[in-house]
Amino acid sequence: MNALNQQYEEKVRPCIDLIDSLRSLGVEKDLALPAIAVIGDQSSGKSSVLEALSGVALPRGSGIVTRCPLELKMKRKNEGEEWYGKITYIGFEENIKDPADVEKKIREAQNKIAGPGSGISEDLISLEIASPDVPDLTLIDLPGIARVAVKGQPENIGDQIKRLIQKFITKQETISLVVVPCNVDIATTEALNMAQRVDPDGERTLGILTKPDLVDKGTEETVVDIVHNEVIHLKKGYMIVKCRGQKEITEKVSLTEAIEREKAFFNDHVFFHTLYNDGHATVPKLAEKLTLELVHHIEKSLPRLEEQIEKKLIETQVELNKYGNGPPPDTSERLGFLIDRVTAFTQDAISLTSGEELKSGVRLNIFSMLRKEFAAWKEMIERSGVTFNWNIEKEVAQYERKYRGRELPGFINYKTFEVMVPGFVNYKTFEGMVKEQIKQLEEPAVLKLKEVAEIVKKELFKVAQNSFVGFPNLMRAAKMMIEAIRKEKEIVAESMLRTQFKMESIVYTQDSTYSKKLGKRKREDLQDGVTGLGTQVKLNTSSTVGNNGTGATLKEMLKHLKSYYQIAGQRLADQIPLVIRYQMLQESAVQLQREMLQMLQDKEKNKVLLHEDSGITNKRIHLQKRLERLSKARLLLTDFSMNIYNFNTTQL
């Protein structure tokens, strides 16, 4: 590590400490942090590399020895300072005084998290090591990829491990450190294949070749070509290391001595000495490379990280606002809290039914729906009018065909005409025809009332759901009240509608109104040159309704009927929606406000109403914790930017 100059050492640690601090805050639950993840097939030499970097023994053996993600935080101390270790997992923290205890502590942690046996878990174990002999570096060690399940392992253990690895290396913030033995075909290794699938251009993948002493004779040049990036290209390139083998571990060769032996191995090797001279070999050179890569990666990721934290803070605050602060613990304050909640709800209900914006910010527009319903009601009246006109004209045409006898054109047999075509001779029969047609609209009007009542109920339910999130009893009480008021107001509105139709049985309009409507229709008919809707009704081959005395009389009476129905229809097109809006919106909202506030008089019931859903309580606590850690993360990033803003690792 002597190659790291003083300036570099001063800047590296803050960068790595920043990310370690963010990870310890739990920020990784909310967004991805820059990291180096170590992956490899089983028996790739992954554990040996990590041991060489950290200076401590890690779990070894056959099968899966890394059963949980292991965050290995290494901090370089000054010469002469004591070794320090600490292990943390799922709320547990323990200091480690002796490096020899590290392996045992990791196994204990894995057994507690993943259970005894060979199962794996996604829960992270954090191991912090501070020593003069380690680099400033943080790595995340992941389980080795198993191809075949052994005794005690689930059949899909390989898939479980791959999913876990995928979870880490898919993130753009993660550098994949792929460990591959020199004595296997690099193209067939599952670890490198996984890295290539998520990083096809090799932008964030670094290859580590291990076990160079086991290379078959004659294949050394292939290994050199791989390290020179000439076989499978990775933009971060390759390193090659020789760690302690099983024989050296059995002989208890120290890590310090192993590093010296490694240096001699590469320096003296016929083929590999060039790799050593180029700085591509040995664990110390690997440590330098990894530290530099991590620092570059952190600095590159910081702007995006700051943006993500700001975005998450806003999203979290917005979501937290939905849940509010929860009921106060002090009994004296709980009534005030309840009154505020109920008042806010009833004000939103009144705003909804009067077409104003809701104070809660929820976007509901009931009038856009009602406008469609009432437009459909008007169209129904108009269609009924068209049918009415057509039926009248049809009856007149039928009379002309069947009942005109010996009379010359211009004469009417009044006895026959009065019997067969009532309504054209006396005013009473005229009234009867109008009443009968209008009566047919009564049930459709009541049906429209029920349809609108259901719409209003559903929209008020939405307001209640938004206003009383987390208070199921209060929400239930509000919904029951909305439903009861709907039924009550629907009965009143229906009575008013039926009264309206009873009044419509009185054929009446102002003389001036009727005269204007009749005059307008006459002018329209004169302009069109046809009767009714502009359709000339054929009576026979020699006469029509419009070209003899009978036709003239009938035509005049048709105009009267159509004119009056148009007036009555317009009156109903306005009056029915007014009744519905008044009762189902305005009166319902006012009564809802009154009854909700009256409900608060019952103090015993208030306790029940303020019972909060435990899920909402937990959600609020979760959001508050997230907000707290993200706020701390933002503060850490701000301090970091202010302290070393002018540092540029590219100059190192």
UniProtKB/Swiss-Prot annotation:
Q: Where found, per UniProt?
A: Cytoplasm
The Dynamin-type G domain is annotated at: 30-303
Chain spans, region G5 motif: 242-245
Record-level GO BP terms: defense response to virus; receptor internalization; synaptic vesicle budding from presynaptic endocytic zone membrane
InterPro entries annotated for this entry?
Dynamin, Dynamin_GTPase, Dynamin_GTPase_CS, Dynamin_N, Dynamin_stalk, G_DYNAMIN_dom, GED, GED_dom
The GO cellular component terms are: cytoplasm; microtubule; nucleus; plasma membrane; presynapse
Q: Where is this region: G1 motif?
A: 40-47
Keywords of the record, alphabetical order, are: Cytoplasm, GTP-binding, Nucleotide-binding
> Which stretches of sequence are listed as region G3 motif?
141-144
Where is region (G4 motif) located?
210-213
Q: Where does GTP bind?
A: 40-47, 141-145, 210-213
Q: Can the keyword GTP-binding be found in this entry's annotation?
A: yes
Q: What induces or represses expression of this protein, per its UniProt record?
A: By interferons.
- Where does the record locate the signal sequence feature? none
Location of the GED domain: 554-645
Stored Pfam families:
Dynamin_M, Dynamin_N, GED
Task: Enumerate the residue ranges of region (G2 motif).
Answer: 65-67
Q: Which GO terms describe its molecular function?
A: GTP binding; GTPase activity; microtubule binding
* Main location group: cytoplasm
Task: Tell me which PANTHER family the record gives.
Answer: DYNAMIN, INTERFERON-INDUCED GTP-BINDING PROTEIN MX-RELATED
Q: Belongs to which family?
A: Belongs to the TRAFAC class dynamin-like GTPase superfamily. Dynamin/Fzo/YdjA family.
Name under which the protein is recorded: Interferon-induced GTP-binding protein Mx
Where does this protein come from, organism-wise? Dicentrarchus labrax (European seabass)
